[in-house]
Amino acid sequence: MPPSVSRALLLLAGLGCLLPGFLADEAQETAVSSHEQDHPACHRIAPSLAEFALSLYREVAHESNTTNIFFSPVSIALAFAMLSLGAKGDTHTQVLEGLKFNLTETAEAQIHDGFRHLLHTVNRPDSELQLAARNALVVHENLKLQHKFLEDAKNLYQSEAFLVDFRDPEQAKTKINSHVEKGTRGKIVDLVQELDARTLLALVNYVFFKGKWEKPFEPENTKEEDFHVNATTTVRVPMMSRLGRYDLFHCSTLASTVLRMDYKGNATALFLLPDEGKLQHLEDTLTTELITKFLAKSSLRSVTVHFPKLSISGTYDLKPLLGKLGITQVFSDNADLSGITEQEPLKASQALHKAVLTIDERGTEAAGATYMEIIPMSLPDSITLDRPFLFVIYSHEIKSPLFVGKVVDPTQH
């Protein structure tokens, strides 16, 4: 790399913590005006976020069909959209089009306003759904940033900024990792393994989620059972069990059974269990239109659900993945990030994303809390998620997928 081209390190940390989880104490209380609630700008960007989520999922899935997948498309999109504030020319266009925005149909101002409203919505303190998204700019102490970029990052993306000396990579790495670890309450540690001394700027984002099942499982019903990783591999997992009223239906287009489980606070988990031998078909055929249809479909019935307790994570180098979606120039020596600073030519040298998922029985924090519902005295349907399946965690408030994933082996952390 020519010495005239400095490095900008782009870091992204997405955390999904489902039962249990923690909401950062320092989360600022941000009110949403009634005007914004009447005109949810984040809904305008929702179709693009959903398309980006599935496109990125397919790129990740193509890399390996034997590992779990878990990432936050919202986290990744937030960080790159914020980066686009300082990008110009083809660099700028590639980033936004790579996030699946049609720039002839959606004005750039609407895109950023959509993300601004999304952040206001997810960071609301009055929601039963504990959800927070945070951005930070980690700036080399001698780097002077453009005033407009700093102001836009703060006003549109609620970004805070702090200074480090990247010439001391170990100290800078410790500060960044400590920031992420603190913000995710210890769920994401050591995000940055190596740091180049030529780094001038780091963008950090994390999304934090604590979901409470609307209908929690009882721990005493959890038993060790088989999970069939593939035709030759079976592992033992703690399998949760619950009889309740759920939306359950079979989709012939996907050759899959769809289970919808709701969280308190206007969020839903869609679990897609493919028919035997149809996992690849499901991954190739799933569309945003089908997800929207599943979320709207009502097929409530008595169902015995058998679901594996799990704690999985995903760590991704986004540079090659996003390159396949057309985002290449920002990582090259031809990057134009002069809207961030004119002091030094910048490029993004690295883009990291780490996400952590925990699913267990607990639906409330209060000891002894009980959920009761009336079950008709007919023979219930049953679904056992004992082989690889896909899932989408969806926020109805922002009409976008918060997290997307695949469980291949629940014992693989």
From Swiss-Prot:
Subcellular localization(s) per the UniProt record: Secreted
InterPro entries for the chain: Serpin_CS (IPR023795), Serpin_dom (IPR023796), Serpin_fam (IPR000215), Serpin_sf (IPR036186), Serpin_sf_1 (IPR042178), Serpin_sf_2 (IPR042185)
GO molecular function per UniProt: serine-type endopeptidase inhibitor activity
Gene3D superfamilies in the record: Alpha-1-antitrypsin, domain 1, Antithrombin, subunit I, domain 2, Serpins superfamily
Species of origin: Oryctolagus cuniculus
Family statement: Belongs to the serpin family.
Protein name: Alpha-1-antiproteinase F
Tissue distribution of the protein: Plasma.
